[in-house]
Amino acid sequence: MRPGTPSTPPRALPHPLPRPDGEQAHLERVWQRPRGWCAITVVNNNYIGLLYIGTALLFFLLAGVLALLMRAQLAVPDNDLIGHDLYNQLFTMHGTVMMFLFAVPAVEAMAVLLLPNMLGARDLPFPRLSSYAYWAYAIGGLVFFCSIFVGLAPDGGWFMYPPLTSSAYSPALNADLWLLGIGFIEISAIAGAIELAVGILRTRAPGMTLDKMPIFAWIMLAFSGMVIIAFPAVIVATALLELERAFGLPFFMADKGGDPLLWQHLFWLFGHPEVYIIFLPAAGMVSMIIPAMAGRPLVGYRLVVMAIVATSFLSFGLWVHHMFATGIPQLSLSFASAASMAVSIPTGVQVFAWIATLAAAPRLRPLKTPMLFILGFFFIFVLGGLTGVMVAVIPFDWQAHDTYFVVAHLHYVLVGGMVFPLFAAFYYWMPFVSRRALSERLGRWAFWLMFVGFNIGFFPMHLTGLAGMPRRVYTYADQYGWGLLNMVSTVGAYLIAAGVLVFLIDLARNCRPSVERNAGNVWRAGTLEWLPAGVAGPRSVPWVSSREPLWDQPGLAADVQAGRYYLPGAPTGGRSTLVTGAIDARPQYLLRLPGPGWPPVLAAVGTAGFFLLLTVKLMVPAALFGVLAIAMILRWLWDADPAPDHPPVDVGGGLRLPVSCVGSASHSWWAMVMLVMVCASIFCALLFAYLFLWTTSPEVWPAPAALAAVPWPLASGALLAGSSALAWTGGRGLRRGRQSCLRLALPLGALMLAAAVGLEAGAQWRAGLRPQDHAYAASVYALIGLQGTLAIAVAFMSLFTAARSWAGKLGAARRACFDNTALLWHYTVAQGLVGTLVLHGFPRWAGLA
């Protein structure tokens, strides 16, 4: 905390009028997007957010077309319109695209677009990371979807259960494309989540303490935490299955001590939290729209925040909800069943808060299109929640499992809980990004077609499921009596498509994207995103003293637009935004932001090319694309920590802020902490796999006498500890101005870290352990492989840091690069020590026990 930074609103506005000539023009010039071909290098959140939303909507439409093809096939019994192989690809791609390429990216996209303005910031803290995440998602997703046109689309279902997807039963490249493609796209989602979390915690407007944050910001903070913890599990699962397919490591082969159930545990450790990762942001949009429509603040703000946190925690206890029919012990099933019911309580708190807000409205406003979609959301989502409680009852789940009842429940929860609120958000926030609002008349047509079509399409699926129709069948015999219900469902699906088509017509007729001249606050809402804004966001950054500042401070919009609050210009000559305290939102320093550039785009191309070429086993081109990705990332990071050569800046009211920061106050330090959390989640998922395989096949574990001798892990641990000590010594030398000490310590420490990994792998090999022998060996080498991956990353970072030192870009006051490297370094050492203890201690304990 900087001494003297204000904790209470200023008595007078920070800047007097008139403002200097040319100040606003210079600000807009600094933030202007590139023209021509260079436009794709834009990094502004308002442009990247629009691109994100447009791409997510494209994937929604493509997945919808696949659904229409499936419904056409199922409309009548014994239909031969589509063969079973293509049908398998259609339902796999439909689920995969909807879940991985539409749902999560769409809510992240809304956050990228809205949050900076909602928080009173100029932009997110890592604009080039936003650009990289978007282009990686767009390029990878489009190439992945195009696989269906060449017969390479995955066909094992969107959750890809082995052994069906093992090389024995799916030897073609289809499954590999899913495993590598989706694993790579999840990395993009994690990058976006880290950016959003740091932005919410560190770039809020002065005065916007945690209890004054908009509900949408709270929810996106919870969303980011859930992504950081949950998504690594599916990355681990995809990596293990790809290792089994490519190199024969038997994680899921029962004859070698593996277990296909491990995939289900890892997948649903990610999969069920993902339901709430999708639902919570949609609920956040509802919590923003309803107060604006009701003309009063949200009832029970603190209770809603508590419900958000409770839902986030409970969602991680529900993964067995999807595994009731797998033979898991009854006690475990009972806990999962209870948790599945308990999670409905915080969800109910939010629903009742919305109803209470509408009931307490001072006057009823005309029912506009956003409210129609929200009312549709209420109806559909509550029905989905009721069927969710039904399938949480174990005996009923055994009957309904893998039938169309579950298909209906899934769509009532996800379409009702996410798609309808998202369309409400499109109609509500369109004036924020467009010169014109969307049409009320066309919006009503779109709503009623989608609402009626959805219920006609999916409600009968409850009945077909109860009548015994299984999921994923491409045809059925007339004698089962499912024909009429399936025809009704098909009619409903095409009605939904008609509603979406009306929405697209509305977009084409009325959407005129404009960052500088939008339609304005047509809803008379009270939150900051409705401030007058341009390409740089709001003209000046306000002091926030309530949750609805536009309602409680009537002159705020005019004063912000006149430049009377903080940071009305570009005092550093470039892009910048305020960094504030994570809890109290006191101004701490001015963050200089990078502008547009090619490195993030080329890094995304390289990353996408690397993973996609690995899929088709083109190793040399894949390596070249990987080199391109690493080179471009290093290039953009080279200038990411500018020299503290600018004097403190007067941002208004006599408040002078430095233009750089080091240590735990730095925004980049917070991002690295979150990256460490991702690494820890990956490590925990691998430890879970290691221990789970012990519980299922202890017979393949070696006796204590067959393990590597004790001196090996002791030597490895000593190297790890020495490596950490060298990193600490380098940091001490940097603080004292002894750069030569740092330049020697970092490469030597990285070498010791790599040697520790090599020693551990060598010890296991000398003990006779081969990764293809059995599941125990495979899990041991997987843990060593993770440690080696982190050691390589630390080696790159240490050499990069040493290079910055040689180039004169590192010092006691310019040490963010070293601080971040040291943070990951010490975590890697800690993980290595824990891993060594587990690999050498647990088998001995288990053998003796």
Protein language model annotation of sequence segments:
Residues G49, C741-L744, A803-A830:
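Interfacial loop-to-transmembrane junctions
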Residues A603, D819-P843:
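Final/C-terminal transmembrane alpha-helix of multipass membrane proteins
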